[in-house]
């Protein structure tokens, strides 16, 4: 499998008020920008405020970057991203099949200033209205999902 990104599914069908865009990209740093670009496209459609888009991009960047950096330890793999629009919220789910970790283990930098890169989970928790993380050491795969309520229904 080469380095190409695969758009797995793009639907605009109204299934109980939900619209979903799915993207599957190689677990490499240069593909984080593609995940951000897909989010920017959705933001244009929804006419989201710039400040909200900036927060969403930061949370997304941290989630995808964590999978790229940690899940596969430099080896080959993929990261799947789903953007789900429901009512007045955007849910973003990032899934990998790499090495799991203990989500309860505190960050070594906890308590320091939040900046992009290094405190990803803390940053996402701060930005999101809802947050879920499923991963375990010694078990393959991690699933991170965050929800941000939008100011207007989608």
What does each model-identified segment do?
Residues 1-22, 67-154:
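Conserved beta-strand-loop-beta-strand hairpin that lines the nucleotide-binding pocket
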Residues 22-34:
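STAS-typified acidic loop motif
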Residues 36-39, 96-98:
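Short, small-residue-rich loop/turn micro-motifs
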Residues 37-61, 113-114:
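Conserved short strand/loop->alpha-helix "switch" segment adjacent to the catalytic nucleotide/phosphoryl-transfer site
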Residues 62-66:
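Conserved polar catalytic motif of the HATPase_c/GHKL fold
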